[in-house]
Amino acid sequence: MPDIQELTPRQIVAELDTYIVGQHKAKRAVAIALRNRYRREKLPAEMQRDIIPKNILMIGPTGVGKTEIARRLASLAGAPFVKVEATKYTEVGYVGRDVESMVRDLAEAAIRMVRDERRGEVKDAADHAAVEHIIDVLHPETKPPQSSATNPFASTLGSIFGNSFGNQNAQPAQPAAPTVAQAPPHESQRIRDEARTDIERGFYDVRLIEIEVEEAAQLPMGMMGGGDPSQMQGGDMSEMLAGLMPKKKAKKRVTVADARRIFAQEEEGKLIDMDAVKREALRRAGERGIIFIDEIDKIATREGRGADVSREGVQRDILPIVEGSTVTTKYGTLATDHVLFIAAGAFHMSKPSDLIPELQGRFPIRVELDSLTAADFETILTQPKNALLMQYTALLAADGVSLDIRPDAIAAIARIATEVNERDENIGARRLHTVLERLFEEIGYAAPESAPAVTIDAPYVVERLGEIAANADLSNFIL
């Protein structure tokens, strides 16, 4: 994938075209918004503070690509991304999720993204250390002597609280194992080199060994009180205290392959600087984060029905988040001034003007997405990367069944999906999933005992779907 900083808006649209059919206006809008972020980063710091993202409101029926455009844009930009539904939130003071949780979710997404990147950077070093651990277990006589350092604070807490922390079923300390005679240095090196080569080649993968695994200390139930940790102000105190508790070690009997994975994970945790991860994640979420608010039309006050306190209250709670505010997360404070908000809704029962005026003003860019036509469906079936028909062909090929899907069959599938959408409920491209599942049901059930090659043409499509599509009552339940 090319560097996002090298992509012009036209090239960003071309990248989105790889996965999404049509909707050129929406793609143009998000491409310009993404490019403006890069343009802003090149400006003086004083001017950067005054340039805020122009939030986008997408209007269009379900299944036309609103969510997919935002998701692919975030993937393309390497930006933290969360998708939330406006209907899940309630006004402050009512039972339910408060709107600030969407910002906390963004912080979590950024932490996962940066942590995964750091894991990739230390993967080789962690794997090397894991192999050395395994050699210590396989050949303890070659393990260099080490002094056992302890955490005095953890030891004090452990002695005060005893088994209140960590594993409640922990076994009492066992007497120390007898000391293993050390091999001469040159002999130790030879043994370790040979063992390292054998482990790398996978010779020991299925061999069972006994290892000690650290178990995170857990605070007793009720010690920190109730409540959702994600809603705690000033950070997760229980997580902080758990880090101060003495680590419990449990013995497990696992294969060498599993031990290598377990040790590598432990080493990654030691090599990654989580403070640096948090700082970078919060910076990235604040500067590049994208929050996609779906079903925003469901919290609009419908015309002629009067004010709805709950709906309008949620809008007013969302307003300061979109305007730019600072939210406290368990990782630190996150400012939303430069987070890009993309809202979307079908607006069947309401209009964008039914949103409160202040919220309307925070989404200055409005794009209307078009309903999909039969020609669009044909393109969706065949053109995008890993298109639907390619997926079904690959799945059946795994069972040795070769599919030959003729062009007239593709046209028939698109026509039937369009007719059902027009007659019943328009669910956009999602209709193709239900149609294709019905079409390939018999072939998928018969494989792999069926014929090794199956041809799908227009008569076959009509045979499988024609009667159901023509019968409105049946199609309501099946398609």
Language-model regions: role of each:
Residues M1-L479:
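Non-catalytic accessory segments flanking P-loop/AAA+ NTPase cores
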